Amino acid sequence: YAPSALVLTIGQGDSAATAGVQRAVTLTCTPKAAGSHPNTSGACAQLRLSNGDFDKLVKIKDGTMCTREWNPSTVTAEGVWEGRRVSFEHTFANPCEMKAGKGTVFEF
């Protein structure tokens, strides 16, 4: 099996370079789901469904109504997914958008 081990973070700020990390967890998906993530099985299942495409995981649900305030939060994923290196970063404009778009992988 190809290794899958990630460090996931949520931070307050508009980029990974400047955001203060508020939470961080580990997630390993092979050979079995493990790590400090509160829902390892669900997060690994969501990653498998997207073929490890993190951009598909941070889509804001259709019909979501959020204010236009700028209070950014940034999520990151670093590590290895099915044998290939991953370095992902996405910034949500505000907490409402983050809640609507982060999915199971960034739910911690």
From Swiss-Prot:
InterPro entries documented for this protein: Prot_inh_I16_SSI, Prot_inh_SSI_I16_CS, Subtilisin_inhibitor, Subtilisin_inhibitor-like_sf
Keyword Secreted: yes
Site-annotated residues for Reactive bond: 68-69
Main location: secreted
GO molecular function, one term: serine-type endopeptidase inhibitor activity
Cell location: Secreted
Keywords per UniProt: Disulfide bond, Protease inhibitor, Secreted, Serine protease inhibitor
GO cellular component, one term: extracellular region
Cystine bridges: 29-44, 66-96
Pfam families in alphabetical order: SSI
Keyword Disulfide bond set for record: yes
Record family assignment: Belongs to the protease inhibitor I16 (SSI) family.
Quaternary structure, from the entry: Homodimer.
Protein name per UniProt: Protease inhibitor SIL-V5
Organism expressing this protein natively: Streptomyces luteoverticillatus
Lineage start: Bacteria, Bacillati, Actinomycetota, Actinomycetes, Kitasatosporales
